[in-house]
Amino acid sequence: MIQYCNLCSEEFALHARGRVPTDIWRIWEDGIFENFEAPIWRELWSEVAKEYRSYEPFWQFMNELVARAANKSQFDT
């Protein structure tokens, strides 16, 4: 999970710096969201989230994404 979240944070940072076009970022973001629709991914995020607290923009992005994924998951069942 840490390795995957590290990759996600790098992708997030590249987009934030304008190094990745928005259309590509949206594809990556959709993929991250799809993974976190699974409850196990959300549980694991809650365990590793503290590791990303020092990178506030990414930490906030992930918390919002995980909340959206949980909400969508709740209505899909």
Stretches found by the model and what they are:
Residues 1-77:
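Amphipathic alpha-helical "stem/stalk" segments
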